[in-house]
Every structure is written in structure tokens, then in C-alpha cells.
Amino acid sequence: MALFTTGRQFIQDLEKSGALGIYVPSEGGFEGRYQRRLRAAGYSTLHISAPGLGDLPSYLTQVHGVRPPHLGKSTQGNTDWGVKTFFLPPLVNYHLENLPPKARGLVLWMIDGKRLSRQELAYLSILPAQEPKVKIVIELGGDRQFRWQPLKEMAAAA
């Protein structure tokens, strides 16, 4: 990969397909350059870790409940000794509502995507069709050079 890159082809492919699977060198640094190019092109980026998200459709686009570990503690003054459920807003919708006025969209940059199942990759490949302002970039593994491929092709091949 060239030391200086404009990232134009990467941004064009991301806008065309909506979701890209990328392979990055293990020494790092390349993904930061492309994130900087995306921000310079007018996109807002959100960097999250793919493992542990749970049910992707509910986590990204619906209000969902989260229960913290109780660690043997009880809720004082409450007759039900269960653990409270906290309801969180949908991640994608919340960030879309709070985008700057001139932003072109939101890019979800997910690391460690190699742990996602084929169904989860298929869902992430169709999410940009449901939410046109959302683009997805998933790091699927390592390689000697920074390369990308549309996620639909990768989900079909996996």
C-alpha cells in the first residue's frame, strides 16, 4: 500500500456497496488513515467492537434492555429481589438523530468482526439499504496490505 493515499476509491466503494469487509495489516495505522479520510469526506464515524453486541438488530435499531451483573447484591427497599433492567436507546438511530447538519452519514467501524456469524454479517450487509445514511466497515482479519471487499460478497462466500 502506498504511504500516501487519498482514500477516494475506498469511499466510492463504501458509498456504492454500503458495507465493506476489510483486512488490515497487524502493525496497524492503516485503518486510522482511512477513518480520517472518511471524516474529511463528511462522514461521522463510530468505532465499536463487534463481539459481545448480542442481538444486532435490537442493539443497533431498537430500544433494548440491559441487565447489569448483580454480584450477589439485592435492591434495597424493593420487594422484588430481581436485577433491574435498564433500557438503552438504539445505537444507530440515536447517532443518526444527532448527526451534524452537514454530515453525509454515519459510518459504523467495527473491529474484530471475524467473530461474527454468517447471519450477523448478512444483517450488517443489508442494514445500509434500510438506513441509507448508515455505512458499515467491519475488520474481518489481517493481511499484508489494507484491502476491502463488499460485505455482501463476503457474507455469501462465508
Swiss-Prot record:
It catalyses: a plastoquinone + NADH + (n+1) H(+)(in) = a plastoquinol + NAD(+) + n H(+)(out); a plastoquinone + NADPH + (n+1) H(+)(in) = a plastoquinol + NADP(+) + n H(+)(out). GO terms for cellular component: plasma membrane-derived thylakoid membrane. It is found in: Cellular thylakoid membrane. The keyword Cell membrane does not apply. Pfam families: NdhN. Its EC number is 7.1.1.-. It comes from the Bacteria. Keywords: Membrane, NAD, NADP, Plastoquinone, Quinone, Thylakoid, Translocase, Transport. InterPro entries: NAD(P)H-quinone_OxRdtase_su_N. The keyword Thylakoid applies. GO terms for molecular function: oxidoreductase activity, acting on NAD(P)H, quinone or similar compound as acceptor; quinone binding. It is a peripheral membrane protein. NDH-1 can be composed of about 15 different subunits; different subcomplexes with different compositions have been identified which probably have different functions. NDH-1 shuttles electrons from an unknown electron donor, via FMN and iron-sulfur (Fe-S) centers, to quinones in the respiratory and/or the photosynthetic chain. The immediate electron acceptor for the enzyme in this species is believed to be plastoquinone. Couples the redox reaction to proton translocation, and thus conserves the redox energy in a proton gradient. Cyanobacterial NDH-1 also plays a role in inorganic carbon-concentration. HAMAP family: NDH1_NDH1N. Belongs to the complex I NdhN subunit family. This is NAD(P)H-quinone oxidoreductase subunit N. The lineage of its organism: Bacteria, Bacillati, Cyanobacteriota, Cyanophyceae, Gomontiellales.
